[in-house]
């Protein structure tokens, strides 16, 4: 299983916003930069104060983190990833979150080619 580290430094978030590729969906926006010769992904999740009270923001963060964890093995490694939550991440169905994440990762070229064995 791939190990994912977390992004916590502000300058890394800003670098992804300015230089990274992005794709937007109903529940989230994903920003990505490919890192050279790195065996692991780094993930950062942001939720705006506009989304709601702390309970709702933390719920959105937990749901996105779990969606990523469940699909982590399908992603290529060596990326810095920032996911920005939208309102639908709080109260939308979990299946929508998963479909959205996989679709956006596919658009950004992060999905591993599936083997049909």
Segments from the language model and where they lie:
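Positively charged, solvent-exposed patches that mediate nucleic-acid binding
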Residues: 1-117
